[in-house]
């Protein structure tokens, strides 16, 4: 990692309200081209801050074994300096890569010394966030911490059994608390997630700030789609419970001819493919895998209803993306998802394919005027998650200014 990582802060102050632009260093354990909520938010945050005139740097794992160092990378027309750490694939996971924990401080200290950032914003406490937070703390740099992490999601890929999982969870949250104590402010996407985090890290103050999305990037369809396409976007991982959706497909009225499109990749695809074949619905399930952004956006626009069967969502950015695309949402009644459903779809009992089928059918068979109201309600609800509100809130935190909790995912 080259020590000479400094670039000049822009002289333009118009985009920052006439105030001095900030030099922001974002530390993330997952970043583009990864496809998951934390990576999506980190990209949105970095791009949005750069568009406001701030100098933005990102530290993240490399996406392969050789691409490590400092690079100019372009995201949605904005060039960011990304400092890629040598990384290795987690053996039990389809795509997750991590830097060796004992190397992070050594490799990031020269970058921090060269940049002298005004603020460090960590996106997790796991590996990169933990190491960078400690280096920033040693130098007296302001630290903001955002938590997108549910230990239960990571433990799916470890050898811990059911008997040892509770112990592992306690250890994971104890470790999180040590890192977040270094932060001047701790945030998480929803009030429910904030309550969960406060309990887990011994009552430290936590602000609920929505990840937010740029709704202008999404295009709601005009009118009702001709077909009945159920859409999911995200990791094809065990905790997403996509098997419940496939089991619900044959329970839907045959006349609907409903199809299920999955945008995303993951290690559950072989098992889900086999399940679809076993149930005789393989011709109605499409696995698109990793796709370019424009394909994802088009799939959302052309969909009929979005489904989120996960029971471990701290906010669910992909559900927000669906709402910005004008889709009704059917989601599991778990964690933060109920906050996203209010006249724009339905909640179903987690893990219950019969209830899911009933709720999907209620949307797919709704009269045109009722279906249009659900679409309109999604578009209205997404206004509270405008990325510009989120950016302004984080700018205030970066400058050490008090902020009110929000906008959050209620």
Q: PLM features: residue spans?
A:
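N-terminal subdomain of nucleotide-sugar transferases
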Residues: 1-84, 389
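Carbohydrate-associated surface elements
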Residues: 62, 192, 212
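Membrane-proximal helix-turn-helix segments that form the acceptor-binding/catalytic region
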Residues: 138, 151, 167-185, 200
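Nucleotide-activated donor-binding/catalytic signature segment of Leloir-type glycosyltransferases, i.e.
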Residues: 271-291
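Aromatic "clamp/platform" in nucleotide-sugar-dependent glycosyltransferases that forms part
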Residues: 311
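Short hydrophobic beta-strand element within catalytic cores of glycosyltransferases
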Residues: 328-331
């Amino acid at each position: 990692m080259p020590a000479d990582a400094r670039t000049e802060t822009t002289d333009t102050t118009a985009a920052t309200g006439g105030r001095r632009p900030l030099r922001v260093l974002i530390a993330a354990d997952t970043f583009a081209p990864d496809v998951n909520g934390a990576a999506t938010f980190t990209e949105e945050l970095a791009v949005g801050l750069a568009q406001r005139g701030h100098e933005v740097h990102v530290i993240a794992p490399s996406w392969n074994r050789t691409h490590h160092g400092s690079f100019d990378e372009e995201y949605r027309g904005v060039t960011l300096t990304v400092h890629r750490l040598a990384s290795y694939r987690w053996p039990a996971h389809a795509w997750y890569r991590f830097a060796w924990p004992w190397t992070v401080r050594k490799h990031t200290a020269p970058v921090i010394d060269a940049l002298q950032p005004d603020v460090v914003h960590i996106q997790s406490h796991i590996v990169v966030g933990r190491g960078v937070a400690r280096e920033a703390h040693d130098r007296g740099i302001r630290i903001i911490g955002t938590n997108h992490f549910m230990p239960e999601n990571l433990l799916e890929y470890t050898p811990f059994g059911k008997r040892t999982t509770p112990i592992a969870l306690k250890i994971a949250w104890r470790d999180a608390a040590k890192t977040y104590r270094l932060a001047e402010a701790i945030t998480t996407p929803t009030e429910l997630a904030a309550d969960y985090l406060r309990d887990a890290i011994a009552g430290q103050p936590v602000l609920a700030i929505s990840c937010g999305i740029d709704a202008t990037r999404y295009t709601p369809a005009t009118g009702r789609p001709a077909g009945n396409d159920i859409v999911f976007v995200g990791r094809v991982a065990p905790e997403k419970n996509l098997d419940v959706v496939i089991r619900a497909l044959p329970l839907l009225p045959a006349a609907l001819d409903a199809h299920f499109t999955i945008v995303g990749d993951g290690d559950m695809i072989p098992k889900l493919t086999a399940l679809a074949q076993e149930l005789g619905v393989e011709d109605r399930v499409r696995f698109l895998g990793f796709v370019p952004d424009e394909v994802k956006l088009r799939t959302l626009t052309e969909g009929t209803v979005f489904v989120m069967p996960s029971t471990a969502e701290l906010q669910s950015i992909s559900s927000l993306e669906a709402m910005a695309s004008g889709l009704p949402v059917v989601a599991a009644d778990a964690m933060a998802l109920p906050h996203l459903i209010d006249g724009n779809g339905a909640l179903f009992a987690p893990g219950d394919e019969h209830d899911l089928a009933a709720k999907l059918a209620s949307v797919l068979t709704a009269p045109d005027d009722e279906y249009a109201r659900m679409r309109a309600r999604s578009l209205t609800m997404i206004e509270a998650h405008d990325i510009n509100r989120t950016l302004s809130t984080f700018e205030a935190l970066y400058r050490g200014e008090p902020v009110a909790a929000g906008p959050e995912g209620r």
